[in-house]
């Protein structure tokens, strides 16, 4: 057997010079050893565990039985504490931690456990459901913490090695490795900004909010979801790109409670095979402009209905989701070059990068005994329209959130519903809606618009 190994080695070594390549045999165990330990040692102190607790009211299951309720009544709700766990990443030595929005959603108390086992309570500085990201600040400390540097996620290539760090199943900090399986995954349906890094590094429940790093120890993504039939890792995990995370951090560091992103002021639609054929495209690619709001950045730059957006700052746009990501990650204050196809020719547009106007939002939560009790509503400003992906010139009052257990959520109202009338009263401002829902009536007739379709709702008082 030894002679066969020697012969095989000889054949390999003898072949190498014929190719003109120099091959050197490893001369020590150190040269053979491949280890990610130096990278892990550098980044692990910046990866934390996030524990969230929320108080919810619930009844004993027996009270769901109508016969039981008939004799004993509805029963008083009991307060219960629900707990969730996830991961986070320290991105600022002052104690700013990035995690997923879904990890801390509706949390009444948040604790962060460091790699050295110390625990700190944390406040929510910013939360952004659109990107499924949130920023926390460690409380009552002037300490400087180990923080991780952000990398350029757009520089990632399929096949690059990456490491995933987090707290799967609450067992403690865990490191897994894999490769970038795909970039620019846009049809996942996890967040409004559907643009993800796909990796086969093992990601499990509890890893949400953890770090995806390259071999330089730079943060290239925040782990957020897995595709699984079993609930555990099956080699298909998704991370929010670091370039999206960068804007969220910048907003938090600037003192904003919401993410400040560039506003386009145009409505884009997907390219279907039929539209692609009508435009003489070889394949469905790009995003079609179906409307431009007056006085918006898009209008000022000369964008027109019918333009086909094909790139942003030289980066190709395959679909609407790709455009949303590319444009949203551009820094405010400058400009972006957007290339469009118009009548078969490429036209270069310079779009100013500014936030949408947000005056007169007048947001409030509806109370009382109407079917809209528990709905948070706002006047539709360009900023609100941009947040909810409505047409920029939409007017009226829109549902921006729904309280868990509120009447509005229970009867089926949804975030993004535009309330047009209540009992024949036209609703133009939130004050109109507040006044209309204070009335005591037996029948509620509400007209709303959802997804461009008008819906008439009739409910008992």
Model-predicted segments: where are they?
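Short, acidic, Ser/Thr-enriched surface-loop or helix-capping motifs
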Residues: 85, 91-92, 114, 119, ...
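Glycine-biased strand-turn-strand hairpin within the trypsin-fold
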Residues: 21-38, 42-97, 105-107, 118-119, ...
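C-terminal recognition in membrane/secretory proteostasis and scaffolding
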Residues: 17-27, 34-38, 87-89, 101, ...
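Active-site loop architecture of trypsin-fold serine endopeptidases
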Residues: 23-24, 29, 36, 58-60, ...
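Bacterial N-terminal signal peptides
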Residues: 6-14
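Hydrophobic alpha-helix/coiled-coil detector that fires on Leu/Ile/Phe-packed helical surfaces
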Residues: 113-117, 141-142, 167-170, 343-345
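Hydrophobic beta-strand signal
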Residues: 49, 92, 98, 111, ...
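Short glycine/Trp-rich loop-beta-loop segment that forms part of the substrate-binding cleft
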Residues: 96, 118, 151-172, 252
